[in-house]
C-alpha cells in the first residue's frame, strides 16, 4: 500500500511539473523558414495549417479529411510576442468536438509532418497552407 501511495505521489508530481512547463510555453508561436516566411506553430514547433475551403467559424474538413488533418485544440491559448490572444477562439465542430481557431478559421496539423519544423502540408492540393499572421486571412481574388 505504501509503494502504491509513493507511486501515485510521483505521478502527481510529474503531472504537476509537466503542466507548469507547458503553461510557461506559449501554446502558439511564430516560426520562420527561408522561402516560406513566418507561420504559426504549437508550443513544440509543430506547424499549424488552415484549409481554404473552411469559412470563419465553420470547418469543411470532416471524415477522411481529418485522418490527414488532425484538429488543433487548446482549451486556453497563450501566445508568444507578435501574436494577439484575442485572435484565437474555439468552434464546436459538427461532431461536437472543439477546435481552436485563428481569426475565426479552424486550425489543423498535417499528419505527414514528422517533426517540429516540418511544413510538408504547405500547398497540398492548393488548398492547405501555413498561416502567416501578417497576411492572414488572405484577401479574396476578384
Segments (PLM) and residue ranges:
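Compact beta-sheet-dominated domain cores in extracellular/mature segments
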Residues: 18-142
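Bacterial N-terminal signal peptides that target proteins for export
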Residues: 1-9
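Hydrophobic alpha-helical segments of integral membrane proteins
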Residues: 9-20
